[in-house]
Amino acid sequence: MLLVGLTGGIGSGKSTVAAMLAARGAVVVDADDLAREVIAPGTPGAAAVRERFPDVVRGGDIDRPALAARVFDDAGARRDLEAIVHPEVRRRFGEVCAALTASDAVVVFVAPLLVETGAAAGFEVVIVVTAEEATRIGRLTEARGMSEAQARARIAAQATDAERAAAAHVVLTNDGSMEELAARVERVWDDLRRRVAG
């Protein structure tokens, strides 16, 4: 089994690269999906979030947009949330990996904060997806409906491409066409398959 961390700034194209790798046979596990799972109603994570952030509970459930807004500009609150969620996400990722029976599996863990959390060191290969800031802002305003100011604030809140690249084994630039990106992903996939084959 080969453990691959996939990261990149918001709007860089992580999800697109993950989908391309999945289409080629990778087992893709998304940290955001696991984060939603570990604070789903009835989980210990949900109870901890409700206790720490009672102001984001609506009708007994966590209002995820309100939670995101609550922690975005408050570093202390964000650290508290990460202390609840990140250990549970790591635990669930471990369970997913343990359940895989194929020794030649390429497991890609997609995590926007892989570098910021120090988790990159736990992966045999780290892939960083980059794109020019103007490209990312365009994607965020068009596809996600953010204002330019919101997009810039989200980008500024994350590690820089240079910080991510310092932890990377592979840097995929995603400023061109889908065809160009697909060709780059194909080369990376071929390399990953060679690594897992031994």
Predicted regions, residues:
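An amphipathic alpha-helix signature
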Residues: 24, 46-50, 133-141, 148, ...
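ATP-dependent small-molecule kinase phosphotransfer cores
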Residues: 33-106
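Glycine-rich phosphate-binding loop of ATP-dependent small-molecule kinases
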Residues: 1-62, 190-198
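Short, well-ordered beta-strand core segments
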Residues: 28, 124-128, 171-172
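Short, acidic/turn-prone active-site loops that include or flank metal/cofactor-
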Residues: 33-36, 57, 132-134, 153-156, ...
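ATP-dependent NMP and nucleoside kinases share a basic, alpha-helical "lid"
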Residues: 93-102, 106-142
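Small-molecule kinase domains that catalyze NTP-dependent phosphoryl transfer to phosphate-bearing small molecules
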Residues: 92-94, 121-122, 142, 146-193, ...
